[in-house]
Amino acid sequence: MQIPGHIDPVTTGTVPLRGGNRIDLVGLSRDAIGGVLVEAGLDAKAAKLRAKQIWHWIYHRGVTDFMGMTDIAKAMRPWLTDRFIIGRPTVREAQVSSDGTRKWLLAAADGQEYEMVFIPDADRGTLCVSSQVGCTLNCRFCHTGTMRLVRNLGAGEIVGQVLLARDALGEWPKGNMAGFGAGSDADPEDDDADDDAVGHYTADGRMLTNIVMMGMGEPLYNFDEVKAALKIVMDGDGLALSKRRITLSTSGVVPMMARAGEEIGVNLAVSLHAVSKEIRDEIVPLNRKYGIEELLQACADYPGANNARRITFEYVMLKDKNDRDEDARELVRLIKQYKLPAKVNLIPFNPWPGAPYECSTPERVRAFSNLIFKAGISAPIRTPRGRDIMAACGQLKSAATRPTRAELDRIAEEKQAALG
């Protein structure tokens, strides 16, 4: 079945970050780093040791300059600098919401733009990470869905978002290497060597504790790169984020869901948003390919899902579209029919210019939530975050496809006319 605006599988290739003729090591596995070191002239034994050291400096210490890798001999550091880089995305724009939410517009080495968002809470800090430049799914309530798909992000570009966020939050450890001294060949009298006895964090008060793959793009249509990136993020010798603190969100790419559970093993969130074929076909066109019943069966079969690791159903509240009491009751019925260990996140619709929907009233959202709660299923209402900087759920869209000045002027004129 051909879905308007849908490409299956995604045919756009990834573009690796490069520093001129130098290879960017961010996004490479530990073995792959060893491989490029061998290609550059090191013997296999030396390359394996150097790969371990470099990995630690990149992902545990946040270092971007080989000259700062103080357990590597001084003579080796310029050799590495001449051949490799430790890249970061370019920050085109950084914004901070009145509620503390932060949004970055990032540019890849080829100039393509994408966004990431950090959401601080009292007990956690969540980074919303993008997996593609644009999106192919055309979900009608989503601003990203109005973009064309440009390309997939590479593993390095995905991991780079996490590294950049940790840079911005100032939460890389300082001090010694926390026991990573084995195999060091640094000069013990090296003036550059670290002196601190104990590593510590210098965060600005809100640490990055959770990652959600809910930024731009459909993660399961960039499976291999997302998998590679999350394996790096979860590696215990580096960023060391538990899989229980990572959530992958999909609009319902059914054939890839089991693989995600088996090969990545993170929490699953599903953009459900409707309980009838007619409405979901309209607002999530992928439903025309993988229907609700097929999707819910894939959820029931998702590896590792249980009452301790529930599947999250995301449900955007659209006025007079999917917010009736009957919709809430049908949602409960479906969850119980498929015996799903699930919770429902109710998301007040976040408006954007030209959006075809309005948000349900607060009273309607509360009534919808209460019906689900009374059936024994958790249905919290998500507090909108970052609306004032277009960073809330469904509002992301890169500057490359933002309105032109003429379009902005036209929108302003229309608003003025409406105000009389």
Swiss-Prot record:
List of residues binding S-adenosyl-L-methionine: 217-218, 249, 271-273, 350
Cell compartment(s), UniProt: Cytoplasm
Record field: catalytic activity: adenosine(2503) in 23S rRNA + 2 reduced [2Fe-2S]-[ferredoxin] + 2 S-adenosyl-L-methionine = 2-methyladenosine(2503) in 23S rRNA + 5'-deoxyadenosine + L-methionine + 2 oxidized [2Fe-2S]-[ferredoxin] + S-adenosyl-L-homocysteine; adenosine(37) in tRNA + 2 reduced [2Fe-2S]-[ferredoxin] + 2 S-adenosyl-L-methionine = 2-methyladenosine(37) in tRNA + 5'-deoxyadenosine + L-methionine + 2 oxidized [2Fe-2S]-[ferredoxin] + S-adenosyl-L-homocysteine
Enzyme Commission code(s) on record: 2.1.1.192
Domain Radical SAM core: from-to ranges: 121-388
Binding-site positions, [4Fe-4S] cluster: 135, 139, 142
Main enzyme class: transferase
GO CC terms of this entry: cytoplasm
GO BP term (any one): rRNA base methylation
PANTHER family in the cross-refs: 23S RRNA METHYLTRANSFERASE, RADICAL SAM CORE DOMAIN-CONTAINING PROTEIN
Note in the entry: Reaction proceeds by a ping-pong mechanism involving intermediate methylation of a conserved cysteine residue.
Protein name: Dual-specificity RNA methyltransferase RlmN
Gene symbol of the encoding locus: rlmN
